[in-house]
Amino acid sequence: MEVIIKAKVKPTEDKYKVKKAILNIFPKAKLTFIEKDNEFGEWEGKTKSVEKLKELLRSQSILDAARMVLEKGMTENATKFYLNKQAAYVGAVNFDIDTHGGIFVKILADENEDIMKIIKDIAPRTKGGVIINEDELEEEEEKEDSEEIKEGHKEENNLKIKVIDNSSGD
């Protein structure tokens, strides 16, 4: 897995505060500042670690919201989203819809990795605020579906019997 990070620095922003915002979420990121023109530039970087992001999502109890954002931004082998700079500056995760001012994050799966598995690791599903094992949940749902189908067949058989009973009573 590789994480690509980009954040534009507007003329009204301090480039080092923007850098701090990125490093608060991705402390192991290797960042480079690229001058775009006299007015602003952009921080670009990469990391392989999402540990701090995972920790913050859990401590802020926003795993389900994060999961929705990660799934919404998912492509075949990646997911992308934006983080709010101001929130990141104070060490918090807040997903941003402002594509012009946020921190752009793209998580790329390696060839032998499944992006959905990475998303499940970063933001697992919860039930009542507790992380649940999705594999067990899927097995449980399949079992419930199977039982519902069996019940449906029993009801159909009972209906057939009743129809036969009613027709023979004439």
Curated annotation (Swiss-Prot):
Species assigned in the record: Methanocaldococcus jannaschii (strain ATCC 43067 / DSM 2661 / JAL-1 / JCM 10045 / NBRC 100440)
Region described as Disordered: spans on this chain: 133-170
Ranges of compositional bias, category Basic and acidic residues: 149-163
Biased composition (Acidic residues): 133-148
SUPFAM superfamilies: RL5-like
One matching Pfam family: RNA_binding
Protein name: UPF0201 protein MJ1564
Membership in a protein family: Belongs to the UPF0201 family.
